[in-house]
Amino acid sequence: MNPSTAQAEVLVDELVRNGVRQVVLAPGSRNAPLSFALHDAAEAGRLDLHVRIDERSAGFLALGIATRTRRPVVVVCTSGTAATNLHPAVSEACHAGIPLIVLTADRPPELRAAGANQTIDQYRLYGTEVRLFDELAVAENRPGQNAYWRTQVCRAASMAAGTTWGGPVHLNLPFREPLVPSGDRDWCEPLDGRADGQRWTEVSGNESAPSTLSKVRSRRGLVLVADGGADSASAWGERYGWPVLSETGGVGLSGAAAISTGMWLLKLPGFMRDHRPEQVLCVGRNTVFRQVQSLLADSEVEVLLAHGGSHWPTPAHNVREVAETFGASPGPADPDWLTGWQQADQKASAALHAALDLERWPNGPVVARDVVDALPAGSLLVLGSSNPTRDVALAANHRPDVVVHRNRGVAGIDGTVSAAIGSALAHGGPSYALLGDLTFLHDSNGLMLGPQEQRPDLTIVVLNDDGGGIFSLLEQGSPEHRGSFERVFGTPHGTDIGSLCAAHGVEHTVVRQRSEFGVALRRRPGLRVVEVRADRAELRGVHERLHAAVRGALHG
């Protein structure tokens, strides 16, 4: 057996022993030893193999799967720029705490700095954005290699899963030719793993008791939920009388403490003067809304963070305590505190939805509400990082039976189609995505599925306003910048999304009437795109009218 084949087979076997069941492969020549080993393992039913020809898409597909399963997913590529194209997914996984195991093939040392083809410096390619980097030595037919290879896989898998907060790890693998199996199975030592399929090295600590917050003691507190932990946060808030707000509004929250219009209420200075919390307990990375950042930067508010690991977010540098879970009771709650938030939520919600009913269809908030209302129970909803996540938070009805996925680690729009497909494959139930046109087009390669690849049951709703609608709501969209806005912020593209879908063999529907929308969203098998065309010129006015309606309901 040639050394590269032996190494690849051992690495794949030990990955399976460490619980890896999902692998995404981008094809190439230098990673051929891994490709053969992965194909054999998939044929034997030991793992599910997904093949993608675009490495960026492959990385985000793996990220989507890992986000839903919370188990390490492996992504494999060849050398050169193939490896650099995984960097956006690695960045997202780093800041969101998603367990990825990145295996990059490389040239052996004698071909580096020598002008060899498809060769770059891959040593620590992803810098500080991986929990572990290791470059394995070039494989040799000598005793001790089996134990070395298996030990390093266990080390990487343990770091990806994380004792407190998992994330991406990177193994760089220099393969020397020959790169294809020779048919000869002779080796200088047995290449078997431990008996009964056990890991080569068991790492204690991944299942130890999580740390808990000890300084939760306010009678007037808020819980702010980003991604993950919505169920436990909802239960904790209801038990102790703390209102629970989310960056996805009422979608994913449950219980009597859930405040579906929380992002609107935080935006009302008059309301917040009377309802300023003493403590805010943040769950995850709350990064979308400026009103949230203003609250967290308030020197009169103590901020606690339920978030494992060292990469906890604190832009205002004022977090009082960080732990993995909420901890014990904060003590007796102010009996009027939660009631005040609940009553405000009821008033704001009634005014908001009455105002939405008056808006002309389609626009972002109205479409977001319609999508959420149409979701079957138990659905997955993937949200694009620009307007869709904001539209759902500001306009959707309360849906505790829906699971939300967002790429909010670094909040880029790249890879969202691929991440949605990965999340849908792992979810196994009805799955939907709500994306803007730029987010969709940025990762349209994600629609490229080979005939032997798994196809998700996923409906992608694209709100197409021909450009960057998010900027209409920011300072750049104010009237004094009208002369430059369209060229450098609006960025119209004129792309025919239907033709693009047809090129990939993906079903596409354009919905022009609201009465058609519910029918188009009915659950059906397979991958499809539902396009809704909107005018972003009206978006700023829509948000101003909704804000005025909520403000009027609470302040007259």
From Swiss-Prot:
Pathway: Quinol/quinone metabolism; 1,4-dihydroxy-2-naphthoate biosynthesis; 1,4-dihydroxy-2-naphthoate from chorismate: step 2/7; Quinol/quinone metabolism; menaquinone biosynthesis. It comes from the Bacteria. Its EC number is 2.2.1.9. Homodimer. Disulfide bonds: none annotated. Binds 1 thiamine pyrophosphate per subunit. Its cofactor is Mg(2+); Mn(2+); thiamine diphosphate. It is an enzyme of class 2 (transferase). PANTHER family: 2-SUCCINYL-5-ENOLPYRUVYL-6-HYDROXY-3-CYCLOHEXENE-1-CARBOXYLATE SYNTHASE, PROTEIN PHYLLO, CHLOROPLASTIC. This is 2-succinyl-5-enolpyruvyl-6-hydroxy-3-cyclohexene-1-carboxylate synthase. The keyword Electron transport does not apply. InterPro entries: MenaQ_synth_MenD, THDP-binding, Thiamin_PyroP_enz_TPP-bd_dom, TPP_enzyme_TPP-bd. GO terms for molecular function: 2-succinyl-5-enolpyruvyl-6-hydroxy-3-cyclohexene-1-carboxylic-acid synthase activity; magnesium ion binding; manganese ion binding; thiamine pyrophosphate binding. It holds the Pfam family TPP_enzyme_N. It catalyses: isochorismate + 2-oxoglutarate + H(+) = 5-enolpyruvoyl-6-hydroxy-2-succinyl-cyclohex-3-ene-1-carboxylate + CO2. It comes from Saccharopolyspora erythraea (strain ATCC 11635 / DSM 40517 / JCM 4748 / NBRC 13426 / NCIMB 8594 / NRRL 2338). Catalyzes the thiamine diphosphate-dependent decarboxylation of 2-oxoglutarate and the subsequent addition of the resulting succinic semialdehyde-thiamine pyrophosphate anion to isochorismate to yield 2-succinyl-5-enolpyruvyl-6-hydroxy-3-cyclohexene-1-carboxylate (SEPHCHC). Belongs to the TPP enzyme family. MenD subfamily. One of its GO terms (biological process) is menaquinone biosynthetic process. Keywords: Magnesium, Manganese, Menaquinone biosynthesis, Metal-binding, Thiamine pyrophosphate, Transferase.
